[in-house]
């Protein structure tokens, strides 16, 4: 086989483990791209480039293909995995993070480590669902869910969270209330308190923006590290 040449191989796979579904619509292949490592992707300019990627159809390792011509550093600094969701678990009677099959495949493989080895940070996006949203939580629910996010990031060696307030207009479950920017800001604050050494970022859209008031004496810029627009 030659270097820098793309090959296609027919595959027939026999599973020796459980958890395989004949009705699934995709499979995740992870290539172990060994080679050069970077302690950091930080640029002398201080500029940081975020990539919010759709995980359902794209391998996050494509970010390793883009390098700066002069410095040789990786182009991207932060990869946002879009997206996990906030849902209400009827059996457990609580709000929790739900992973799509694509997200599960990524965080349970060595994809995050490979991106870390290239000096990039990896952040999980948390999107609303039909059951709950990131701008709908009461103070108590914000605190509890923030700890779940912190535990999630710790378990999968992620560098933070990206809150996205879309696709949710229901607040009929316990722990939820009328949505507002103030509710989204409170969740950001509680998340920063739960994981002060990790990133808390927001999509500048809907109610995850327009944070004007202090929370517990803290300015929004003290508990939101980055706000990202299209």
Enumerate the predicted regions with their spans.
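Chitinase-like catalytic core of GlcNAc-active glycosidases
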Residues: 38-230
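Short, solvent-exposed loop/turn segments at the edges of extracellular beta-sandwich modules
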Residues: 14-20
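Surface-exposed, short loops/turns at beta-strand junctions within beta-sandwich domains
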Residues: 2-5
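C-terminal edge beta-strand
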Residues: 22-37
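Extracellular recognition modules
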Residues: 8-14
């Amino acid at each position: 086989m030659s270097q820098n040449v793309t090959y296609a191989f027919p595959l027939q796979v026999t599973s020796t483990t459980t958890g395989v579904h004949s009705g699934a619509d995709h499979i995740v292949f992870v290539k172990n791209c060994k080679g050069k490592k970077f302690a950091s992707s930080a640029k002398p300019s201080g500029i940081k480039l975020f990539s919010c990627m759709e995980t359902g159809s794209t391998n996050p390792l494509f970010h390793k293909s883009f390098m700066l011509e002069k410095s040789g550093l990786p182009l991207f600094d932060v990869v946002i995995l879009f997206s996990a969701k906030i849902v209400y678990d009827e059996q457990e009677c609580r709000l929790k993070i739900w992973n799509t099959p694509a997200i599960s495949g990524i965080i349970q493989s060595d994809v995050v480590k490979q991106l870390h080895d290239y000096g990039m940070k990896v952040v999980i996006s948390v999107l609303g669902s039909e059951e709950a949203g990131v701008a709908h939580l009461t103070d108590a629910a914000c605190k509890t869910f923030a700890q779940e996010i912190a535990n999630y990031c710790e378990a999968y060696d992620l560098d933070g969270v990206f809150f996205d307030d879309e696709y949710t207009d229901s607040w009929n479950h316990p722990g939820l209330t009328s949505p507002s920017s103030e509710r989204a800001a409170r969740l950001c604050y509680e998340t920063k308190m739960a994981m002060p050494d990790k990133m808390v970022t927001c999509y500048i859209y809907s109610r995850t923006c327009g944070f004007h008031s202090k929370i517990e004496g803290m300015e929004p810029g003290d508990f939101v590290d980055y706000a990202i627009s299209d």
